[in-house]
Regions:
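Short aromatic-glycine-enriched beta-strand elements
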Residues: 16
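Acidic, proline/serine/threonine- and glycine-rich low-complexity intrinsically disordered segments
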Residues: 217-219
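Acidic-enriched and Gly/Ser
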Residues: 19-134, 139-215
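Extreme N-terminal "head/tail" segments of very large remodeling/mechanoenzyme assemblies
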Residues: 3-12
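Low-complexity, intrinsically disordered short peptide segments enriched in small/polar/basic residues
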Residues: 31, 229-230
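Conserved small/polar residues in nucleotide/adenosyl-binding loops
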Residues: 221-228
């Protein structure tokens, strides 16, 4: 599928207006080409064939006519083992890896995989033939004191999905297939330990929403300035 492209028609700070010849979605990720740099942004408004994008990098050098390419994907985060041991910037770039590649002065237009390409111990929680829906756990992976549940993607529609196959307990790469699902139509979906989720799309596959029932008590320092008539002279 060809990606939708367009060109810059206006720049105001970190906001860029662009005209496109194809379909554009709100919250879609796009890139402005400035020389050798591809600057990441998000569509925040669509009006006909014109879209307003918020660019999450320095916009120095962007000019009217610069090429813009849409990714076809919504602004998302990656979820999975390795997430808790990382330090990220606002685009989920791992800062230690960025520093190794760019030094102390980070360069714009550099984007790295959020989840490290490591091996983890996977324990299956389902067996072939089990019926599953969005949010069900198919396995678990320990990361320090925390246990990750490897879940059926939250956005998977309920179409009679069942487990076709699942890996035995063992050590696998985070992006290896650990389970395969199949629905009533014969469609298959491979699951790894990692999946992406749009940051502005609510998660609705929950059984119960827990609401707070206790007041959060915090301590603070109260500094009071005493003023006297002598202080004002």
């Amino acid at each position: 599928m060809d990606k939708v492209t367009g060109y810059v028609t206006g720049v105001n700070g970190n906001l860029v207006a662009a005209t496109f010849s194809g379909s554009v979605r709100k919250n879609e990720v796009g890139y402005v080409q400035v020389g050798d740099d591809r600057l990441k942004g998000e569509v925040i408004r669509v009006n006909g064939d014109t879209a307003s994008m918020q660019i999450y990098e320095m916009t120095n050098g962007i000019q009217v006519g610069d090429r813009v390419e849409l990714s076809g994907e919504l602004m998302s985060v990656e979820l999975g083992p390795g997430l808790l041991t990382q330090v990220f910037d606002g685009l989920q770039n791992p800062l230690p890896e960025l520093a190794q590649q760019c030094g102390f002065f980070l360069q714009r237009g550099v984007y790295l995989d959020p989840i490290p390409n490591k091996d983890w111990e996977f324990t299956p929680l389902v067996k072939p033939g089990d019926h599953v829906t969005a949010g069900d756990a198919v396995g678990s992976v320990p990361e320090g004191l925390f246990t990750h549940l490897i879940m059926v993607p939250f956005g998977l529609k309920d179409e009679g999905w069942r487990v076709k196959s699942v890996r035995e307990k063992g050590v696998y790469n985070v992006r290896d297939t650990v389970a395969v699902l199949e629905n009533d139509n014969g469609e298959e979906k491979e699951l790894t330990m990692v999946f992406s989720w749009p940051v502005k799309q609510p998660i609705r596959c929950y059984e119960e929403r827990l609401r707070p029932d206790e007041t959060l008590a915090v301590s603070y320092t109260h500094l009071r300035a005493h003023e006297t008539e002598a202080d004002l002279v």
